[in-house]
Regions:
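Hydrophobic anchor at the start of a short beta-strand
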Residues: 7-9, 96-97, 178
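Phosphate- and divalent-cation-binding pockets in alpha/beta enzyme and binding domains
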Residues: 81, 188-189
Length: 203
């Protein structure tokens, strides 16, 4: 996204190419946004990003298919939980969600099982590796410079120059802004910037 603006942008990557880490190792599922807290930034980004993704995939030349998603259930307890997700999705603006019975489940996906399900038509799938590469190629075409094999070892502040000094195993870079997108190593970069590291638990 930053490559669309008149900025001088560089990416420091410790690997020798893009798509060598977490970015290309996820499920490849485009989420609809029915699991995120209503009103949260994550919910807003998920729903808006979902709605825009057909155009994004087209611009990047990345294969993408809106397969829809089935959240299946068997018991009354399952139904109660699924209806909670449906309510969350409706608050977040997810369109087209509906409860379906076993016959309709079998028409959509005979292997899914379940006595009932929530059908979410806006979910989809893509190849996360191709998507990551597509984003990088697009950014490169727009003028972003990629520096590979550049593991960041330290970040300090130079107040006199009003810049951050980023040191890698090979070079030193000076920048007005640092964007931490280090995946599973993001906490290490945050600590270099002076932010405390604290553990969090997923759901």
């Amino acid at each position: 996204e930053l490559s669309r603006y008149q900025l001088k942008t560089a990416v420091l990557e410790k690997e020798l190419d893009v798509a060598c880490g977490n970015s290309s190792r996820n499920t490849g599922m485009l989420h609809a946004g029915f699991t995120y807290k209503p009103g949260s930034l994550k919910a807003e980004c998920a729903v808006e990003g979902n709605q825009e993704f057909d155009q994004v995939a087209k611009e990047l030349g990345v294969p993408f298919k809106r397969t829809g998603k089935l959240v299946v259930g068997f018991t009354d307890h399952d139904r109660e939980n699924i209806l909670k997700y449906k309510a969350i999705g409706e608050q977040n603006g997810v369109k087209g969600m509906r409860m379906i019975d076993k016959d309709e489940i079998n028409r959509i996906d005979p292997n899914a099982g379940g006595e009932f399900a929530m059908y979410v038509p806006s979910s989809g799938i893509l190849d996360p590796m191709q998507y990551t590469i597509g984003l990088a190629e697009n950014a490169c075409q727009n003028g972003v410079r990629f520096h590979f094999g550049q593991k960041v070892t330290g970040i300090t502040r130079d107040e006199a120059k009003d810049v951050w000094v980023v040191k890698t195993e090979q070079d030193t870079f000076e920048t007005k802004w640092v964007i931490n997108c280090a995946g599973m190593y993001a906490s290490e970069i945050s600590e270099m910037l002076g932010y405390p590291n604290y553990p969090v638990k997923g759901f």
